[in-house]
From Swiss-Prot:
Its job: Catalyzes the isomerization of 5-dehydro-4-deoxy-D-glucuronate to 3-deoxy-D-glycero-2,5-hexodiulosonate.
Protein name according to UniProt: 4-deoxy-L-threo-5-hexosulose-uronate ketol-isomerase
GO molecular function annotation: 4-deoxy-L-threo-5-hexosulose-uronate ketol-isomerase activity; zinc ion binding
Keyword set, alphabetical order: Isomerase, Metal-binding, Zinc
Gene Ontology biological-process entries: D-galacturonate catabolic process; D-glucuronate catabolic process; pectin catabolic process
PANTHER family assigned to the protein according to its UniProt record, in alphabetical order: 4-DEOXY-L-THREO-5-HEXOSULOSE-URONATE KETOL-ISOMERASE (PTHR38461:SF1)
Pathway of action: Glycan metabolism; pectin degradation; 2-dehydro-3-deoxy-D-gluconate from pectin: step 4/5
UniProt enzyme class: isomerase
Length: 278
């Protein structure tokens, strides 16, 4: 488990390129037949990937000491979106088939969660966010047909994109975790511009669907102290509540956003005009 401490905005603005990457970038999300796990002190979110290839993968009691529990989801809820080939997730013996871009919410208290791929040639890639939970909500599968996609932006401003809200109150109940998937239309490069902050929630972006020769310049920092982190395919970045979170790519891309914090009101954000950015 990679533990990332919280960082003050006054400290963050003094960091160089490598310092910013060390604090906020999750460089390696998927490793064959393993799970990755980054624990952030910011709202206690856990971020990672699970890619079963030749065997099943599960998170066992080995994380208990670091989390202060006897099993992974004893006090946590889990959100998973599959960006790879078809797979399965077994939750306390109940098996769910999770295809490409299907998702699964797992409620607090699930003791055994086992991940598998159906075809080793095209393994599943389960990206997950995990957050502290105060009560148990039912485990539920969510498919792309259930997420009521919303298209925003314009080709003229190069930010035409479709937002798919997987884990939001209109779709299912969670304690605090919200997740979704945003896909840019071909030829469009910007996400979340004009940008915003939200003091009551932190957020993590996971960028994928990118060619090897492409990248995204992820914008972060306070609106008057902006910085950037160069992102490549299948990498994640942690965004504190004081930071903007936007990006521009060399080509179109897709990203998964996940939020935890004080509320789940999607529009509870503080907008920043482009003219006010520095």
């Amino acid at each position: 488990m990679d533990v990332r401490q919280s960082i003050h905005s006054a400290h963050a603005k003094t960091l160089d390129t490598q310092g910013l990457r060390n604090e906020f970038l999750v460089e390696k999300v998927f490793v064959a037949d393993e799970y990755t796990m980054v624990y952030s002190h910011i709202d206690r979110i856990i971020v990672g990937g699970i890619m079963p290839v030749t065997k099943t993968v599960s998170v066992g009691g080995e994380v208990g000491k670091q989390l202060g529990v006897s099993y992974f989801l004893e006090r946590r809820e889990l959100g998973v979106i599959n960006i790879g080939g078809a797979g399965t997730i077994a939750v306390d013996g109940q098996c769910y088939e999770i295809g490409h871009r299907d998702a699964l919410y797992v409620g607090k208290g699930a003791k055994e969660v086992v991940f598998a791929s159906i075809d080793t040639a095209t393994p599943a890639k389960f990206y997950y966010n995990c957050a502290p939970a105060h009560t148990t909500y039912p485990t539920k599968k969510v498919t792309p047909d259930e997420v009521s996609p919303v298209t925003l932006g314009d080709n003229l401003t190069s930010n035409r994109r479709t937002i798919n809200k997987y884990f939001v109150p209109d779709v299912l109940e969670t304690c605090q975790l919200s997740m979704g998937l945003t896909e840019l239309a071909p030829g469009n490069l910007w996400n979340t511009m004009p940008c915003h902050t939200h003091e009551r929630r932190m957020e993590v972006y996971f960028y994928f669907n990118m060619d090897d020769d492409a990248c995204v310049f992820h914008m972060m920092g306070q609106p008057q102290e902006t910085r950037h982190i160069v992102m490549h395919n299948e990498q994640a970045v942690i965004s504190p509540s004081w930071s903007i979170h936007s990006g521009v790519g060399t080509k179109a891309y897709t990203f998964i956003w996940g939020m935890v914090g004080e509320n789940q009101v999607f529009d509870d954000m503080d907008h920043v005009a482009v003219k006010d950015l520095r």
